[in-house]
Amino acid sequence: MRVYKTYIQQLSFDGIAYKKGEVADLQKRFRIVCSSFPFKRNPEAKDLPSRDWAGEDGRDIYIPEKIPMKNYEIEAVFVYKGTEGTISSDISDFVDFLYGRNENAVGGRLAVYDEYVGMGRKDVHVLSVDNDVYECSDADPDAIAEFKVKFAVEDPVTEIIPEYVSLSGVNAVRDLRFNI
């Protein structure tokens, strides 16, 4: 059975160029997998400028060659599996990473790619993290947590293309590429 991974890369943008951090394999770095990252393949169009004249049929509307798309919000579901001794620090490290508050952070702007969905977006940022974080069972030595994170996708159209590299026969993502 194939395990589909989610990759996140911290970004910063100075108005001219992007600075990129390392690509984080969530499973390897934080012991977290994503069970749902519902990117929109076809986002909603922005409202176009128009005038509605009372004495005329229809409206005057400006229709550009490419209709611009709206940003949108999504709620992703993450699952953690570790031990009771590490659950708090692992999830805190993950949340700090998402907010760009970790050590050596590049920024809170993110590029995200989900292998299961087969797509990703850039200029993603966190809006909130669910406070109902985890559930531990006394009978199970593993700590399992499910929690939700709300993201804003500010660039709803730029495709992310993962750049894979083979390390000892195992594919890993080296960079999340996109055109600007």
What label would you give each PLM region?
Residues 1-180:
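Extracellular/virion structural assembly segments
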